[in-house]
């Protein structure tokens, strides 16, 4: 009994430590996104002044920041994953190796940080639109246009189990494998009652595991971005409706 209590205590401390580390990383991620937004605004001003070389330098710097953004995101996800899977054992646990292995695996997943492509595209579109508003950027095809500056990298807009919009979830989590988003309590209950279950999103074959359904470092930022986009869309619809009414009069 004492041994079990001690093990629970160790696991609890590991979880608490992971929360602190992820929180610190989240602050870094937020700072990077703010820096990228600021650099985008500066690049737009430089493009207006036809200072192409400086714009290119800024784009290269943004690319470097987004690489750091990706690494921070992977580190946070790796920390959460290792903490969730941790089971106390008699021999010493090599946490550095566990974290490094998880980080390497995450970094090898091509779609694990889609928001980086989204942020870079936003930067390039803002610069392009200075002199070419309304024109497609060079190299754009139908697939490229799908990811526009008015879209968010969230794969699903509603929780497949609760039916709630992702923007209204009280405690959102995301599968590390298929990247779909759910309400935490609902998906964990689903996993308990359906061992070895697939993701409940129609057509998705992603496997569900407790340890791989987490609130990763970027999820809350993406949900907040979606809320902002929804507000902008609603304002645009109101303006359009008002304009139509005026035209009819």
Curated annotation (Swiss-Prot):
Pathway: Protein modification; protein sumoylation. Sumoylated, possibly via autosumoylation. Its main location: nucleus. Its EC number is 2.3.2.-. Changing residue 178 to S: Loss of function. One of its GO terms (biological process) is cytokinin-activated signaling pathway. It comes from the Eukaryota. A zinc finger (SP-RING-type) spans 141-228. The keyword Hydrolase does not apply. InterPro entries: Nse2(Mms21), Znf_MIZ, Znf_RING/FYVE/PHD. The keyword Cytoplasm applies. PROSITE patterns: ZF_SP_RING. Keywords: Acetylation, Cell cycle, Cytokinin signaling pathway, Cytoplasm, Metal-binding, Nucleus, Transferase, Ubl conjugation, Ubl conjugation pathway, Zinc, Zinc-finger. Zn(2+) binds at residues 178, 180, 199, 204. One of its GO terms (cellular component) is Smc5-Smc6 complex. Disruption phenotype: Dwarf plants with short roots and defective meristems. Interacts with SCE1. E3 SUMO-protein ligase that modulates cell cycle progression and functions as a repressor of endocycle onset in meristems. May function downstream of the meristem patterning transcription factors PLETHORA 1 and 2 (PLT1 and PLT2) in root meristem development. Modulates the expression of the mitotic cyclins CYCB1-1 and CYCB1-2 and cyclin-dependent kinases CDKB1-1 and CDKB2-1 in root meristem. Involved in cytokinin signaling in root development. Belongs to the NSE2 family. This is E3 SUMO-protein ligase MMS21. It comes from Arabidopsis thaliana.
């Amino acid at each position: 009994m004492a041994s079990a209590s001690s093990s629970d205590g160790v696991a609890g401390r590991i979880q608490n430590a992971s929360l602190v580390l992820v929180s610190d990383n989240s602050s870094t991620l937020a700072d990077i996104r703010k820096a990228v937004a600021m650099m985008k605004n500066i690049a737009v001003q430089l493009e207006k002044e036809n200072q192409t070389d400086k714009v290119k330098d800024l784009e290269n710097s943004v690319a470097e920041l987004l690489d750091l953004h990706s690494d921070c995101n992977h580190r946070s996800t790796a920390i959460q994953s290792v903490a969730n899977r941790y089971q106390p054992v008699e021999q010493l646990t090599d946490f550095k190796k566990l974290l490094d292995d998880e980080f390497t695996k995450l970094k090898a997943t091509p779609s694990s940080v889609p928001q980086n492509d989204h942020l870079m595209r936003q930067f390039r579109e803002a610069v392009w639109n200075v002199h070419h508003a309304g024109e497609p950027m060079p190299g754009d095809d139908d697939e490229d246009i799908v990811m526009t500056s008015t879209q968010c990298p969230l794969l699903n807009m509603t929780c497949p189990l609760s039916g709630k919009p992702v923007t209204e979830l009280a405690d959102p989590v995301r599968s590390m494998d298929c990247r779909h988003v759910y309400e935490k309590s609902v998906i964990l209950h689903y996993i308990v009652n359906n061992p070895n279950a697939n993701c409940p999103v129609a057509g998705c074959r992603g496997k569900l595991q407790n340890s791989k359904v987490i609130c990763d470092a970027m999820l809350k930022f993406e949900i907040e971005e979606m809320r902002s986009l929804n507000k902008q869309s609603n304002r645009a619809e109101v303006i359009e409706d008002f304009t139509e009414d005026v035209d009819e009069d």
